[in-house]
């Protein structure tokens, strides 16, 4: 899957789940499961419930995503 195929959306972290998974509510109101991208994991970026994040969604499965940015 190339970078052009992903869908970027904004959302809020609702809950932290095991194995670095998070429940995220998108601005559209949809709830998805998301994991942390490699760069955030390598740099030990902490993500807590209530944080605003940018999520990349695959066009093939819109219920799962990857957190690529945490807003300040």
UniProtKB/Swiss-Prot annotation:
Transmembrane segments: none annotated. Residues 1-72 form the S1-like domain. The keyword Phosphoprotein does not apply. The keyword Signal does not apply. GO terms for molecular function: ribosome binding; rRNA binding; translation initiation factor activity. Pfam families: eIF-1a. InterPro entries: NA-bd_OB-fold, RNA-binding_domain_S1_IF1, S1_domain, TIF_IF1. GO terms for cellular component: cytosol. Keywords: Cytoplasm, Initiation factor, Protein biosynthesis, RNA-binding, rRNA-binding. It is found in: Cytoplasm. CDD domains: S1_IF1. Belongs to the IF-1 family. Component of the 30S ribosomal translation pre-initiation complex which assembles on the 30S ribosome in the order IF-2 and IF-3, IF-1 and N-formylmethionyl-tRNA(fMet); mRNA recruitment can occur at any time during PIC assembly. PANTHER family: TRANSLATION INITIATION FACTOR IF-1, CHLOROPLASTIC (PTHR33370:SF1). One of the essential components for the initiation of protein synthesis. Stabilizes the binding of IF-2 and IF-3 on the 30S subunit to which N-formylmethionyl-tRNA(fMet) subsequently binds. Helps modulate mRNA selection, yielding the 30S pre-initiation complex (PIC). Upon addition of the 50S ribosomal subunit IF-1, IF-2 and IF-3 are released leaving the mature 70S translation initiation complex. This is Translation initiation factor IF-1. The lineage of its organism: Bacteria, Bacillati, Bacillota, Clostridia, Eubacteriales. The gene is infA.
């Amino acid at each position: 899957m190339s970078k052009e195929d992903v869908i970027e959306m904004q959302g809020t972290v609702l809950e932290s789940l095991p194995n670095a998974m998070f429940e995220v509510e998108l601005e559209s109101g949809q709830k998805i499961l998301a994991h942390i991208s490699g760069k955030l994991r390598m740099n030990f970026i902490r993500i807590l419930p209530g944080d605003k994040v940018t999520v990349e969604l695959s066009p093939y499965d819109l219920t799962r995503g990857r957190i690529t940015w945490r807003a300040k």
